[in-house]
């Protein structure tokens, strides 16, 4: 069941947390990218638009109720985690910007549950275009699509700023753009 966000405020995006934050309390939010259950420990790769951060759920830290809740997590659940930044006790993941740290979760809130997605939300996964378009909201979470959107936004912002500094006005009129059939 989804929980309220009342009183929650994100302190960092996933890749903004670094080894300089070790020992600090942080609040991160995002989608569950992967979940690994090792019995006494549960590891979750939390993904937001900035990247991935590993979350550690240890029953000794989060308590039985929180650990049981972490056990129910599945891919693409939206969660908020408050915890302490710690140095990874296991192997460092050189492929991640945050590969040398993890968050030892002290509280977990499930903000939204999700059914199993129709395709994996990962890079380099080949999915039929009609499926990707049907589930566009999921496709937009893929890192390669996000990087395209971010680049397009930056170019549009720089173009607007340049033209505004040159004294141009931005005028929106339907006569300058092609109309879309059926309001699509």
Predicted regions and their residues:
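Class II aminoacyl-tRNA synthetase catalytic cores and aaRS-like
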Residues: 1-184
């Amino acid at each position: 069941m989804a929980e309220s966000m009342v009183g929650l405020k994100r302190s960092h995006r996933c890749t903004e947390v670094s080894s300089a934050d070790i020992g600090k309390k942080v609040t991160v939010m995002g989608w569950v990218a992967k979940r690994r259950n090792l019995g006494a420990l549960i590891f979750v790769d939390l993904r937001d638009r900035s990247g991935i951060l590993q979350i550690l759920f240890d029953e000794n830290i989060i308590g039985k109720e929180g650990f049981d809740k972490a056990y129910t997590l599945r891919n693409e659940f939206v969660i908020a985690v408050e915890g302490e930044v710690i140095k990874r006790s296991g192997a460092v993941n050189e492929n991640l910007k945050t590969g040398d740290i993890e968050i030892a979760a002290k509280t977990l809130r499930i903000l939204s549950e999700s059914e199993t997605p129709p395709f994996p939300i990962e890079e380099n996964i080949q999915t039929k275009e009609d499926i990707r378009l049907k589930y566009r909201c999921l496709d937009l979470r893929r890192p390669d699509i996000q990087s395209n959107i971010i680049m397009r936004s930056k170019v549009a912002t720089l173009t607007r700023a340049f033209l505004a500094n040159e004294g141009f006005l931005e005028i929106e009129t339907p006569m300058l753009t092609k109309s879309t059939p059926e309001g699509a």
